[in-house]
Swiss-Prot record:
Organism superkingdom: Bacteria
Record bears the keyword Metal-binding: yes
One example GO MF annotation: 2 iron, 2 sulfur cluster binding
HAMAP family, A to Z: IlvD
Gene that specifies this protein: ilvD
Name of this protein: Dihydroxy-acid dehydratase
Functional summary from the UniProt entry: Functions in the biosynthesis of branched-chain amino acids. Catalyzes the dehydration of (2R,3R)-2,3-dihydroxy-3-methylpentanoate (2,3-dihydroxy-3-methylvalerate) into 2-oxo-3-methylpentanoate (2-oxo-3-methylvalerate) and of (2R)-2,3-dihydroxy-3-methylbutanoate (2,3-dihydroxyisovalerate) into 2-oxo-3-methylbutanoate (2-oxoisovalerate), the penultimate precursor to L-isoleucine and L-valine, respectively.
Cofactor requirement: [2Fe-2S] cluster; Mg(2+)
Coiled-coil ranges (or none): none
Keywords on record: 2Fe-2S, Amino-acid biosynthesis, Branched-chain amino acid biosynthesis, Iron, Iron-sulfur, Lyase, Magnesium, Metal-binding
Protein EC: 4.2.1.9
Cofactor note: Binds 1 [2Fe-2S] cluster per subunit. This cluster acts as a Lewis acid cofactor.
Length: 560
């Protein structure tokens, strides 16, 4: 066992003495058992994580009962909703790298034999996945589970996005104080990751397709007793993975990631999933061209529409309808979409995992013969405005905005944009541009949920497009195009735009362009002053210097 390095031999007496002091070692026989790291992410200020302290206790008990010795440690976390709309959001994406490094550090320093990862919300899931791939020890993921949907007094279903959009409705006089307060009080009714197909839930669902989690990981509610049963099953299964030495490198391949992308396209997951999946694949030494996603999308139908793409279906409905296994089972009817032979943490192949799955509600999970659209719910656009690509959640775009041409309204930051939108500056037909908010420029590529929700709340969702080198919340809906690469801080073409420039967005044909010649773009870029970092000390200053583009997953530069 790996852990023998810290526990066996006469020279390890000091190590054993320290280990006995933890209370985890109850007898000398325990030194003959595998040491299992419990990578938890309990934190009081994130509703998706407030229950993970007790959740981890149950997992530790199950590990010990199964013959392992559990050692729990915690990572940091950022709640994207609470960090939204102010400087705090700059820390969100950057926290992913800290989490990956922190998990690597604890496991690497203490030579743990295996790991159970307990993430839930946005950056914690991919951060732990990156660490798991990097460490390459037997690992299983068990998330904390989704939140229940909120219900208003009149029976209307609401979620966090309803509250954000309520701010826009309130600012434009569409609702009063009482309505906004009711939304506030009902949007997030329980612990768990927010109830729609937002980034956290999207990533927890993708863990099933990647083969890193047991079936049910992405959709069983945090407050459902089945979640605790799944956690106990994961604790038992980690011992099997240790016994058979099944590691992430045995499970993850290019085909595994394509399976995850196919699921993402079929359920219209968050655009952030592209960023994170690229980063996880990078850790595995697997590189993807963003154009590959469009090729896959062309043969992957969009069959499960969940909030924010619709207001009446949430993650709990997907679970009731058969869960991720049912979506994958439906996709398996199509040739060339899934590789069902890929191994998973269950000890079975993906195909074996979903063999008995069935769609229990066809209003929630459509058949491949009757999709919402014949192509996937995400797309990558290319053109002279985004030579390296940009992404859009097509499943959440109003049909009227799938093709749009309009004048640019430029904002140099998210704060400037929010102020302008709230003042009523944005007019129907315009293309709002928010720049210098990319991985380097932000820094941290902040999410744009506040401006997009305000636009929706003001009734402009089918009249205005928004493009940015930043990114969007998984809860964003509308013609919102993010991850524009290269970013403005790297002298990307988005930095050359001026108010009134004509921008054309053509989602069906995967194109985005500004009506300027290459020569004009180049001349404007040459005339710009050097980029001046917004933050010059601390972690974000270092992050800004080391981060790469969104097109490569916004990972840190390699020094290999």
């Amino acid at each position: 066992m790996r852990s023998d390095k810290i526990k066996l031999g006469f020279d390890k007496a000091p190590h054993r003495s320290l280990l006995k002091a933890t209370g985890a070692i109850q007898s000398d026989e325990d030194f003959q058992k595998p040491f299992i790291g419990i990578a938890n992410s309990y934190i009081d200020i994130i509703p998706g994580h407030v229950h993970l302290h007790d959740f981890a206790k149950r997992i530790k008990e199950a590990v010990r009962k199964a013959g392992g010795i559990p050692f729990e440690f915690n990572t940091i976390g950022v709640d994207d909703g609470i960090a939204m709309g102010h400087i705090g959001m700059r820390y969100s994406l950057a926290s992913r790298e800290l989490i990956a490094d922190a998990v690597e550090t604890v496991v690497g320093a203490h030579w743990l034999d295996a790991m159970i990862c307990i993430p839930n919300c946005d950056k914690i899931v991919p951060g732990m996945m990156m660490a798991a791939v990097r460490l390459d020890i037997p690992t299983i993921f068990i998330s904390g589970g989704p939140m229940k949907v909120g219900v208003m007094a009149d029976g209307e279903k609401v979620d966090l996005i309803s509250v954000f959009e309520g701010v826009g409705e309130y600012s434009s006089g569409k609702i009063d104080d009482a309505r906004l307060k009711e939304l506030e009080n009902n949007g997030c009714p329980t612990c768990g990751s927010c109830s729609g197909m937002f980034t956290a839930n999207s990533m927890n669902c993708l863990a099933e397709a990647l083969g890193l989690a047991l079936p049910g990981n992405g959709t069983i509610l945090a407050v459902d007793p089945k979640r605790e049963a799944l956690a106990e099953a994961a604790a038992k299964q980690i011992m099997t993975l240790v016994e058979k030495d099944i590691k992430p490198s045995d499970l993850l391949s290019r085909e595994s990631f394509l399976n995850a992308f196919a699921l993402d396209l079929a359920m219209g997951g968050s655009t952030n999933t592209i960023l994170h999946t690229l980063a996880i694949a990078n850790e595995a030494g697997i590189n993807f061209d963003l154009a590959e996603l469009n090729t896959l999308a062309a043969k992957t139908p969009y069959i499960c529409k969940v909030s924010p793409a619709t207001k009446n279906v949430h993650i709990e409905d997907v679970d009731r309808a058969g869960g991720i296994s049912a979506i994958l089972k439906e996709l398996s009817k199509l040739d060339g979409v899934l590789d069902l032979s890929r191994p998973t943490v269950t000890g079975k192949t993906l195909g074996e995992n979903i063999a008995d799955a069935e769609v229990k509600d066809k209003a929630v999970i459509h058949s491949v013969e009757d999709p919402y659209s014949a192509t996937g719910g995400l797309a990558v656009l290319f053109g002279n405005l985004a030579p390296q690509g940009c992404v859009v959640k097509t499943g959440a775009v109003d049909p009227k905005m799938m093709q749009h041409t309009g004048p640019a309204r430029i904002y140099e930051s998210q704060d400037e944009a929010i102020s302008g939108i709230l003042k009523g500056d944005v007019q129907a037909g315009e293309v709002v541009v928010i720049r210098y908010e990319g991985p380097k420029g932000g820094p941290g590529m902040p999410e744009m949920l506040a401006p997009t929700s305000t636009i929706m709340g003001q009734g402009l969702g089918d009249k205005v497009a928004l493009i940015t080198d930043g990114r969007f919340s998984g809860g964003t809906r509308g013609a919102c195009i993010g991850h524009v690469s290269p970013e403005a801080a790297e002298r990307g073409p988005i930095a050359a735009l001026q108010n009134g420039d004509k921008i054309t967005i053509d989602i069906p044909n995967k194109r985005i362009a500004v009506d300027l010649s290459d020569e004009e773009i180049e001349a404007r870029l040459k005339a710009l002053p050097p980029f001046e970092p917004k933050i010059k000390r601390g972690y974000l200053a270092r992050y800004s210097q080391m981060v790469t583009s969104a097109g490569s997953g916004a990972v840190l530069k390699s020094f290999d």
